[in-house]
Amino acid sequence: MTVTQEASPKRESLHIIDDRTGSYYSIPIVNNAINASDFKKVTAPEDKAYPANQTENGLRVYDPGYSNTAVSHSKITYIDGLKGTIQYRGYSINDIVGRKTFIDTAHLLIWGHWPSTAEAETLQQRLDQVPVPQDFVFNVIKSFPRDGSLMGMVIAGLSALQSSDMNAIPAHVGKTIYLNNPELADQQIIRVMANMSMLTAAAYCHHIGRDFTPPRAGLSYIENFLLMTGHVEAATGLPNPRYVNAIERLWVLIADHEMTCSTAALLQTASALPDVISCMVSAISALYGPLHGGAIEVAYKNIESIGSISNVPAKIARVKAGKERLYGYGHRVYRVTDPRFVFIREILNELSEEVEKDPLLKVAFEVDRVASEDEYFTSRNLRPNADLFAAFVYKALGFPPEFILPLSILSRTQGFMAHWREAMGNPPRIWRPGQIYTGDLNKSMDE
């Protein structure tokens, strides 16, 4: 049953008595949220002892890490961390995975509805028509050492691509371009989607010393990516359909994940109204961190460091003693098993022939078994998330561990584009969070 937000929700409010002044305030509650700006009404006389508290300017809300702060309204993705559910535009991923293609899901996220057959064909045609980047863009990637940062190659490639169309940069043309201009925003979305796939493939080919194969019209987004990276069958020159199907489902699962650290970084940058490539660079840089997207590569290396099943108990003991961290377990949002985890295990089961070649997966399964039965983990609601096994899907498909994160970013590009497009349709307001100054005041240069 479709549930829609009430047009006129009942009036609710938070009542505050400030014991500093005895003043009473009523702050409206809408969608189980209060407007932080309403606290500016809660003022007090200047704090003479420490003026930096700015009591006369209104009460501030301190929330390090944004653990309980909503910074925007969005209609794209809904996550219920207590129930372990994810919905894209109101559709459960349980109903989407295996029934809709990745490109259909991208259309849903970005444009708000499932594409008709004609719309899906048009989207694929527009992607096919995006030209291969100019040679200087590829040369930037090739200037890196082959064993250099793959993430750095992608970021550098994007930066070079940005310079190939200076008229797409608002600061260069001296005006805002994309705000409330969905047609122009959509052109950039198509440009980024196509080029992210090509640049990521180019970085991979440079890394392993393989020639880059240009995309081919008539192939799907994922088929073309596998073609560009050289992951094709000798007999047909085309990607293995089983591998295409595995990536289709995996990328549907991780196409968007609401207000993540990287999405917030993208939107923080977008609030200043630059071009979309600048926003993507911000998002990718945030994803590189081991507490965010980098966790997928770290989770694999964490399992790799264990080495064998016999070493699992010692690893668990070190984690419980606080000496080490078990990446791939626990999540900022979920208090139950990550809903994507179940589907990823299904994908791995279907790739059993390839998976058997990776003995580390048996170690990962043993870690999962031991942790799921250990009171230390169960009492803290530390359950496996998608990071733990997603890496093994890519490994089974023939990609090295160091390419896991670039693959993850490519799969998330469509989600980033959805959030950027939504932001460009909202009233402009630069994100400029405050701080609580706790340092010294009024020092003398003579002291």
From Swiss-Prot:
Pfam families: Citrate_synt (PF00285). Keywords: Transferase. CDD domains: EcCS_AthCS-per_like. It comes from the Eukaryota. GO terms for molecular function: acyltransferase activity, acyl groups converted into alkyl on transfer. Pathway: Secondary metabolite biosynthesis. One of its GO terms (biological process) is tricarboxylic acid cycle. Its EC number is 2.3.3.-. Coiled coil: none annotated. InterPro entries: Citrate_synth-like_lrg_a-sub, Citrate_synth-like_sm_a-sub, Citrate_synthase, Citrate_synthase_AS, Citrate_synthase_bac-typ, Citrate_synthase_sf. The active site is at H331, D387. It is an enzyme of class 2 (transferase). Citrate synthase-like protein; part of the gene cluster that mediates the biosynthesis of oryzines, natural products with an unusual maleidride backbone. The two subunits of the fungal fatty acid synthase oryfasA and oryfasB probably form octenoic acid. This fatty acid is most likely activated by the acyl-CoA ligase oryP to give octenyl-CoA before the citrate synthase-like protein oryE catalyzes condensation with oxaloacetate to form tricarboxylic acid. Belongs to the citrate synthase family. This is Citrate synthase-like protein oryE. It comes from Aspergillus oryzae (strain ATCC 42149 / RIB 40). The lineage of its organism: Eukaryota, Fungi, Dikarya, Ascomycota, Pezizomycotina.
